[in-house]
Amino acid sequence: LNFDDAFQAIEKKATALNCGYKETNFRLRDWGVSRQRYWGAPIPILSDGEENFHAKDLPVELPSKVEFKGVSSPLKDMPEFLKVDQEGKALIRETDTFDTFFESSWYYARFASFDSHDSMLDDRANYWLPVDQYIGGIEHAVLHLLYSRFFFRCMRDMGLVEGDEPFTNLLCQGMVLKDGAKMSKSKGNTIDPQGLIEKYGADTVRLFVLFAAPPEQSLEWSDQGVQGAHRFINRIWKLVNKHIHAGLSEDFDVNHSNKDLKLMRSKIHKTLFKVKDDYLRRHSFNTAIAAVMELSNDIPQEWFDSSASPEMRKVANEAIESILLMLNPITPHLCQHLWWQLYPQESIIDKSWPKIEESLLIDDKLKIAIQVNGKLRSEIEIDKETEDDSVKSMALNNEKIIKHLAC
């Protein structure tokens, strides 16, 4: 029996023997009403001091003109709102309101039909929902996100929305830490990035924040890290200007490029493929930045000299364009300025993602691991068209392998 069948068989046997039965235990949680405002969602309950009654005139509308006289709710000081006559009974209205979690449980749906006056939602909500990507703190896992699913299914049952889930993908971002602790005014360990922005620029600070850690992990703030990001931006600035001063090259037939040029173009397109995947699917911005850094290091510096061949200059230009387009979502001011220097009549924001050549994603070389008695002893690199017999011969004649075969 598999697990489910065994579970059913045990339940059936226990019931037949009258020694047990199946019961569902729900892990229900109290609704935390803690972030209240007087203008929060009103609770439609009336009381005569001994018994509670439902308000019959719905919706309950809060007054727009109130006076704040202290820390208590201003609604308690408004007799015209507080006191209600319902079927001859003098009742007192509930002045507590639901907290912010109540509205945030369905705000994403209301945004899609914000100007609908006849209903909570209209057909536009079904067009936009579910939310493709939802980003929020992990502290919402058992509160806001739970309530949102509850609300969405209530709205589904009411015929307001279609589907079962409000969010398709969820990313819980980490915290920014200072000295290993969560930033807090009471601890005095807060950081104001404005000073760093004024010194290094917004692009530098943004680059550091996205490069320092994966989005789902906590980030330890470091001024030294900001300086490192600034050095990289300066390097890109110098690289592009060196390329511009060397002069741009005419097109050439990539099918006639030599081995080094083809390897460099392969590196460019593999990086484009990885960065696109990191941005759109994995949301791994730190690895995307690392890949661009690696590409910028791999371009031979002599290709940026005016003495370099037209083919080298053209591949260098392809690399520079790709680097700027990949960095543009993170460092838009830098990339726009450098793009204008390359192409004064163009704006980088109007450019599409470069077309990735699938043929350049396939390696011409393969790495083959060689094991002896189940243990890795060496590794060889071969052309992908190499025949099996040649691979075996290369492995058997490998110095590290010969040593182990002789034992």
Residue ranges and their predicted role:
Residues 45-56, 60, 170, 176-177, ...:
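Acidic, turn-prone loop/beta-hairpin segments
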Residues 1-38, 116-117, 368-407:
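NTP/phosphate- and nucleic-acid-binding module
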Residues 13-17, 123-139, 190-194, 212-223, ...:
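Glycine- and acidic
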Residues 31-40, 231-239, 261-277, 281-302:
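Core structural elements
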Residues 1-55, 66, 187, 192-225, ...:
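Residue patterns forming the tRNA-binding/recognition surfaces of aminoacyl-tRNA synthetases
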Residues 96-134:
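Active-site-adjacent "gating/activation" loops or surface patches in catalytic cores
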Residues 1, 92-98, 134-137, 177-203, ...:
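Conserved phosphate-binding loops in nucleotide/dinucleotide-binding enzymes
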Residues 31, 61-98, 102, 111, ...:
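Flexible, glycine/threonine-enriched loop-and-boundary segments that flank and lead into catalytic domains
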